Design a protein with these regions (language model features):
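Hydrophobic/small residue at the entry helix of a nucleotide-binding pocket
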Residues: 4-5
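Rossmann-fold dehydrogenase core element
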Residues: 78-83, 94-134
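Adenosine-nucleotide cofactor-binding segment
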Residues: 1, 14-71
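C-terminal hydrophobic helical "lid"/dimerization subdomain
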Residues: 115-164
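Rossmann-fold NAD(P)-dependent oxidoreductase module
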Residues: 8-12
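Residues in the short beta-alpha loop(s) of Rossmann-like NAD(P)-binding domains
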Residues: 26, 88, 113
Length: 164
């Protein structure tokens, strides 16, 4: 957890009634995620299944890519789903295909969705009064500093540019 999409996904999942576990490289970001409602925060380099007490999850939202895909597959229950929308650590992953089909997993790629899905999302946001977490707002002239903060991956939430 850390970026704007991940923090918003945490809010969406909580509003939908899900029990939410998040992962991060940063203890500080995990602490913030707990403040936003996550049940548990897992460090990226620990055994996620062990950290969850041996349990597995119904759905994994995978936004990192190659560096965490295998751990995501290990953490999802038999018949569960992995939804992927990002690949910041690499586009190519390899995984045990036999384990995948014996596990009866579903793998779903996602981008922006359809117009109908967008409308449903807007209704959900309004109904649950969701607001994105904003880490920092920079004047447009400081766009380089804003991108440096984004590149550093130190933010928790959105980085915004103020225009005008």
């Amino acid at each position: 957890i850390g970026g704007g999409v991940a923090t918003y996904l945490l809010q969406f999942a909580k509003a939908a009634g899900a029990m939410v576990y998040v992962t991060s490289r940063s203890q500080e970001k995990l602490a913030k995620a707990l403040q936003y409602g996550a049940e548990k925060g897992l460090l990226h380099d620990e055994d996620w299944v062990e950290a969850m007490g041996g349990g597995k999850v119904d759905v994994v939202i995978e936004s990192v890519g190659a560096a965490t895909f295998d751990k995501s597959l290990d953490a999802v229950r038999r018949g569960g789903t992995i939804v992927t929308f990002g690949s910041s650590t690499g586009d190519l992953v390899t995984f045990d295909l036999r384990k995948f089909f014996y596990g009866q997993y579903t793998l779903k790629g996602s981008t922006m969705g359809s117009f109908e899905e967008y409308e449903a999302m807007i209704r959900f946001v309004e109904e649950h009064d969701l607001h994105p977490v904003v880490d920092a707002v920079y004047p447009a002239e400081q766009f380089k500093e804003a991108f440096q903060r984004l590149e550093s991956a130190e933010q928790t939430g959105k980085i915004a540019l103020q225009i005008g």
